[in-house]
Amino acid sequence: MNLRKTVEELDQKYHDRKVVMVDGNDNELGSCGLIEAHRDSGVKHRAFSLQLYRLVGDKKELLLQQRAVEKPVFPFYWANTCCYNLAPGEMYLPRAVSRVKEEMGVVVDESVLRELYKFSYCSPDIEGWCENELDNVIVGE
């Protein structure tokens, strides 16, 4: 049984959702639809990956999540705490705070978050889907 959503189902769900197209230096080039950004070889777009951790004694525990079936790319995979494709006008840290609350119910203050680095990658999935992102890695406790 294939639980993965069809292109038509995803297009209906994300029809109005836009992402920010960028070059390799995070300069804005415009916007495009979320589905367009993830089909075939994808369109380079702005994203963040948030990794939350907590100290337990002398060890750090990472908060992971399993990606939802509604995700166009890599549904059901285990991943970082939260990741997201930014829409036009959204800023990295404020959107990371609001998105982790929406997705995980976790309340985080922006002051505990740090932007570590950005990297660009392209990772094809099965069935014609692809992540093609300039990803800002954010960590917090």
Label the predicted regions.
Residues N2-R4:
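Short, contiguous pre-domain boundary segments
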Residues T6-D58:
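Acidic, metal-coordinating catalytic segment for phosphate/diphosphate chemistry
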Residues H15-R17, R46-F48, C82, E115, ...:
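Residues that flank catalytic or metal-binding motifs in active/ligand-binding sites
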Residues G42, R46-L86:
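A glycine-rich, hydrophobic loop/mini-helix early in the fold
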Residues R67-E70, E103-E141:
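Active-site segment of metal-dependent pyrophosphate-handling enzymes
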Residues N85-L93:
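Acyl-donor binding region in acyl/amide transferases
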